[in-house]
Structures are given as C-alpha cells and as structure tokens.
Amino acid sequence: MKTKQDFPSINERKADGVREDGTPYRVLIVDDSMFVTKQISQILTSEGFDVVGIATNGEEGLNKYKELFPNVDIVTMDITMPKMDGVTALEKIIEFDKEARIIMISALGKQDLVKKSLMLGAKNYIVKPLDRQKVLERILMSLQQ
C-alpha cells in the first residue's frame, strides 16, 4: 500500500515547464483574443514556463519572434487573426528559423488550415476550447521533437 511519502509534494514535483537544469522553457503567445492569451499564460506559468512575449496578430508575432530570437523555445499561434493570419506568420517564422517550434491554435471547423499548417512546419495543434491537459501535453510533445 502506498503511503503519503510515496508521492512527491506539490513543492517537490518538477514543474513541466522547467528543464532539468532548472531554467524555464520560454513561450511566445500569439492570439488576438485577450481571453485566450490570458488562459494559455495562466496554464503555462502555473507549470513553470516563462511567457516571454504576447502578440495580438501574426505580423506582431513575427516581429516579436525575430526580436526575441533565439530566446523563444516554443510559440502558440492562433490561426485566424487580423493583419496577418497565423498560417502566414508560421510560414514567415519558419523561413526565418527552420528550427522554430510552433503550435497552431484552431477553432473547430478549421481542419483544412490545420493540415496546411502542419505541412508548412507547425509541430502540433490545439483545438479550442482550450483544455489545460491538452495544452500541456501538446507543448511538451513539441518540445521533445
């Protein structure tokens, strides 16, 4: 029978967003919905990730990525945004940095754009509404690729 000592306390457990050396993974969030950016930010920071930037459209996301490069480990990118959509921003970021890890965020019914994004180099995708566990799983999977 397992006792309390067999389970790490919340303070002893390594946060998912922290590397073995203790440094956090750095995330850029690109989404035009303040609700979504706040939700992703809360999920990730609670697990030790460092949100290094937030952008509200693809053009701003591209510029922020270039400004922060190479200090971004992963990007979450909404597909449908003003000024520059997420697919175009993905394409331009991949042109700039072939090693970029980008996860697309999509509403239901955007499967054609999700497929196109994956073909262009996105590492994974998340479908809205966001689920905490799925967000963490997809990000951690993409970081290991």
Feature annotation, model-predicted:
Residues M1-R26, Q133-Q145:
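Non-catalytic signal-transmission and effector/linker regions of two-component phosphorelay proteins
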Residues M34-G53:
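Two-component/phosphorelay signaling modules centered on CheY-like receiver
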Residues N57-E60, D85-T88:
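Acidic catalytic/metal-coordinating carboxylates
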Residues F69-T76:
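Active-site beta3 strand of CheY-like receiver
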Residues M81:
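Receiver (REC) domain active-site loop signature in two-component systems and cognate sites
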Residues K128:
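A Lys-centered signature of the CheY-like receiver
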